[in-house]
Amino acid sequence: MSTHNTKEEFEQAMQKCRELFVKKLHDYGVAWRIMRPETMTDQLYIKAARIRSLQIKGCSKIDEGIVPEFIGIVNYSIIALIQLELGVANTEDISNDKATELYDAQAKKALELMLMKNHDYDEAWRCLLYTS
């Protein structure tokens, strides 16, 4: 059995997700603050449906690959958690810096939860197929 540094792997993956989040903040600001929970679940569904489509078809007309879709799922999930915590706003009511701070706090909570779950489940998730 190979050994994994799950915490390090998580942090590396989250760094890629965070970089894109910050880039999008620079481009669009916190426009997502007006999104209701239903909008967030729709965005997650769209990403999951695209992943499934790419896996089934094995090709796409827009060659972006599957990794950006997984990054999108992570980022939309964190945005949804922020929205649930703050509530929906009618305007862009927080700064980009505050949004990044909230993003980091949710990512930290996710890491802590994953590490606790891994203790209890012995990283059983590593045996799952990513296509499931």
Could you describe each region identified by the protein language model?
Residues 53-68:
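A cross-kingdom feature marking solvent-exposed beta-strand/loop segments within repeated
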Residues 91-94:
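Charged interaction scaffolds used for protein-protein
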Residues 1-40, 98-126:
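Extended low-complexity intrinsically disordered regions
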Residues 44, 70-81:
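Short, structured motif recognition centered on aromatic/hydrophobic residues
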Residues 130-131:
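Conserved small/polar residues in nucleotide/adenosyl-binding loops
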Residues 49, 53-56, 78-86, 112-115, ...:
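Charged/polar positions within long, soluble alpha-helices
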Residues 34, 38, 64-71:
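An alpha-helix initiation/capping motif
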Residues 40-50, 76, 106:
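Amphipathic, well-ordered alpha-helical segments in soluble domains
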